[in-house]
UniProtKB/Swiss-Prot annotation:
Source organism of this protein record: Drosophila ananassae
Enzyme type, top EC level: transferase
Protein name: Protein arginine N-methyltransferase 7
EC number: 2.1.1.-
Record has Protein biosynthesis as a keyword: no
Stated role: Essential arginine methyltransferase that can both catalyze the formation of omega-N monomethylarginine (MMA) and symmetrical dimethylarginine (sDMA). Specifically mediates the symmetrical dimethylation of arginine residues in the small nuclear ribonucleoproteins SmD1 and SmD3.
Amino acid sequence: MSCFSQVLNPITGENSWQEREDDYDYHQEVANAGFGDMLHDWERNQKYFAALRKTIAEMRTAGKEVHVLDIGTGTGILSMMALEAGADSVTACEAFLPMANCAEKILAANGAADKVRLIRKRSTDIQIGEDMPRKANLLVAELLDTELIGEGAIGIYNHAHDELLTEDALCIPARARCYAQVAQSPLAAQWNSLKSLANLDGEPLLQPPAQLKGCKGEAGLHDVQLSQLPSHTFRPLTDPVEIFQFDFQRKKQREKKRDQLLKVQSNQPGSAELVFYWWDIQLDDGGEILLSCAPYWAHPEIHELSGKKGKDLPLPNVVPWRDHWMQAIYYIPKPLQLLEAGKSFHLSCHHDEYSLWFDAREEAPAKSVSRHTCTCDLHMTYSRSRIGQMNQSTRNKRYLRYLEENIEAEKSKVLVLGNGCLLGLASSALGATSVQLHEPHRFSRRLLESIVQHNQLKNVEFVDKVEEVEDSQLAGLTHVFAEPYFLNAILPWDNFYFGTLLAKIKDKLPEDVKISPCSARIYALPVEFLDLHKIRAPVVSCEGFDLRLFDEMVERSAEQAVTLVEAQPLWEYPCRALSEPQEILNVDFNKFSEEHHLKGTIDLKHPGTCNGVALWVDWQLINDSSPRSIVSTGPSEAVTPGEFVKWDMFVRQGVHFPQKTNQTISSLAWSTDFKPLLGQLSFTFGQKKP
């Protein structure tokens, strides 16, 4: 059966009714759960299997029976490993029913249906005697995330030891260690705080108010593939230090909240702005089988791994790739200036049941440092990438060049469309007679109002809807300006909402009004990802176990719930270009309502496996041939077939993953259909063999 659901269309800005199957939410959860990513993590799989073999063999040698509990079994892969390693009994629990049903079929397909007791419950709901005949003496689980404890591992382990495990139970993993490294990074700092906006001569146009400068920001992690952060963009100020240990095996309760004050020493002068964070796990009791999530420069096996990898693979990519356990950046509330190498300071580390936070101070704090939150609206309103985008110098200069060349003091009247458009506010500082900002979002508007007040801008008016602008005001406009950026946008072309807003008032604007951007172009680039394609690639088998039933389940769900193009920050996921970029859509905002139906072929110029197509938008600020009139959301440097692509680090690009990625092709057929009045933009891509 099917039902109708209200869905916001980002291009039209309106809710529309879409017919969807009753189980659409289930399919969406299955398709986006990330199980496949974990199953492609060869190091995780091999080391879990090795730890099970080693631990079960040692328990056997000690004369013990082995009764295994697998919490959050997923596909059942760890349960099957435990059986293969010689466990006497295995109980697996999985609360996500679609996954539990799939696990049941996978266990049967691998001959383990009658050997694994599958419980469709959370582990915290399991009762001994009712669900399990006895307590387990070996727990195997994967309950961790990038932050280690963000999925509730502390509470789950505490409950398991209290209710489900014997006094002498062992755990895989046995323990975890968390690490921090204090660093300075002008680039990463742009993701956290708002800088002054200056004109092309470097003179300030807009200054952030005191409430922004004094805000401590959000304590939450910024999860990134830290190995992909260019080495020239940061300076480690300390060596990595161990900050917390979590003993998953001990019977005593794991504390839900701890504070750790470490006296550390700088290895060079700089500003202690942020903390790089990662963890490792010792999978066996003896600590011999180690899995590290460290970035490449701190990875304990970097020399061994770099010797095994091909010479054409960049050093940051020799460490095992995974997207479910990344690294994180935590921003220090008030950066600490370290004036010399060898300077001692205090790193304050804290965790509660689900999260961590940090501070750095010259003197030891007198009491525990509370978890900080945003008090300025910036961090609670915008994503990290958007905050960075607002600070992005090269991008801002192109917009400011247009504004400085076109805004006439005491003559220009400007309408700004978008959310949080500081560049639009800059037109007021440049002398525009009036500036009207379309800003319907409550917190974004409050932030901009504070900037207007602090910079004493007298000619700025906010409007909730473009329809509220009086006809006489529209008729007197000299400029309509946008970046464009809208809070509801996920994919780059979702910001075509600018065209929708413009179309509502176009007939009331003077003929000579200047509209910027005047047009937008979408480009497509066939690429070969090193790893990102694995999040959608079939698993087939894992450590000798047949997982094709899992692939079929995910494929069915993906067909119903996954868009053909998804948003990804491609700077974190290296890929080689297989051709030059090709334009697949050009939208003229003066004729936005026109439909487009296009198709073509991209010839591949470099041999490789096309396992992805990257897509992005170039905004044309003014209709001329200067490259400085283009603001791109795609590559930050010219693309060369066969070379790695360098991507804009402050926006997400679109990615299409072909269904078949294991064959060499000579060209890629594409088609684009754009119906702006309906807000429908779709792409198709078809591979052509040589």
